[in-house]
């Protein structure tokens, strides 16, 4: 088995929604309730389930877009949830995200050059403008974007091209982990296949680990090494792609496979 690079232990995210009476106990919605899993180097772990199952809240909590209620997220021997300041900034360099909507996730006032280069600008990881330019153009080439596109703006591109820009932005610092939040659901089927193949190529070149959130089981079957099924904030089943698709154990997993698609 390959190296474990991320361990999530008993992750919880509870939202207070009220009280039982004026002075009664607090009432909570348990969006994520005791989720644990591991991610191995160079693999793709897919998280699937219907809308409201907790899959998106899980990844938002583990990268602290929303602060979790409790749990541990062990990255490189450190609990990511306890890091602050420069330590947190440094750790975040190793976890990046590709978003569902390739248009709304890109600043319309920025050129492709500046969108892709922004993470490098924030980290100051180049010596001069020439090195910055080479880094950006090399990254564009890696994701199949023509270097002549560098001075254009997001509205000038198709959905697939915009997603390539988003992918370039995510990989420019060579992170170890990328969270893919429904990265192809807004794209045409023919474009979906090209983006999935690109993600797989980049994974082989850069040894990236993906956490892949999706409601499309067809896409999951094509890209995932392992699959984690969530229902009402809990992990109900986890296994290899073949185990989940060919020999599901939990009734909820069987239902998802039967309908062929877990609706968002």
For each feature predicted by the language model, list its residue ranges.
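Helix-to-loop junction immediately C-terminal to a conserved catalytic motif
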Residues: 63
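Conserved ABC transporter NBD signature motif
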Residues: 71-79
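Conserved ABC ATPase "signature" region
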Residues: 79, 130-148, 257
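Conserved ABC ATPase signature
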Residues: 153-157, 161
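A short, proline-enriched helix->beta-strand linker immediately N-terminal to the Walker B motif
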Residues: 172-176
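ABC ATPase "signature
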Residues: 238-239, 247
């Amino acid at each position: 088995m390959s190296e474990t690079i991320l361990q999530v232990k008993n992750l919880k995210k509870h939202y207070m929604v009220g009280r039982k009476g004026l002075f009664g106990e607090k009432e909570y919605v348990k969006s994520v309730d005791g989720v644990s899993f591991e991610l191995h180097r160079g693999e793709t772990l897919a998280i699937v389930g219907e809308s409201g199952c907790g899959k998106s809240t899980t990844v938002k909590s583990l990268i602290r877009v929303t602060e979790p209620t409790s749990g541990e997220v062990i990255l490189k021997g450190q609990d990511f949830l306890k890091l602050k300041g420069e330590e947190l900034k440094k750790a975040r360099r190793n976890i990046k995200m590709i978003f569902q909507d390739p248009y709304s996730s890109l600043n319309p006032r920025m050129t492709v050059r500046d969108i892709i280069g922004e993470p490098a600008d924030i980290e100051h990881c180049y010596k001069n403008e020439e090195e910055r330019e080479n880094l950006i153009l090399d990254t564009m080439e890696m994701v199949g974007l023509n270097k002549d596109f560098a001075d254009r703006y997001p509205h000038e591109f198709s959905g697939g091209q915009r997603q390539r820009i988003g992918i370039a932005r995510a990989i420019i610092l060579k992170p170890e982990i990328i969270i893919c939040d429904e990265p192809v659901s807004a794209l045409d089927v023919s474009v979906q296949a090209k983006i999935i193949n690109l993600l797989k190529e980049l994974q082989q070149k850069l040894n990236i680990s993906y956490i892949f959130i999706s409601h499309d089981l067809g896409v999951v079957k094509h890209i995932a090494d392992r699959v984690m099924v969530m229902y009402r904030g809990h992990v109900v089943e986890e296994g290899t792609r073949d185990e989940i698709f060919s020999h599901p154990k939990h009734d909820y997993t069987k239902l998802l496979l039967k309908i062929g698609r877990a609706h968002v």
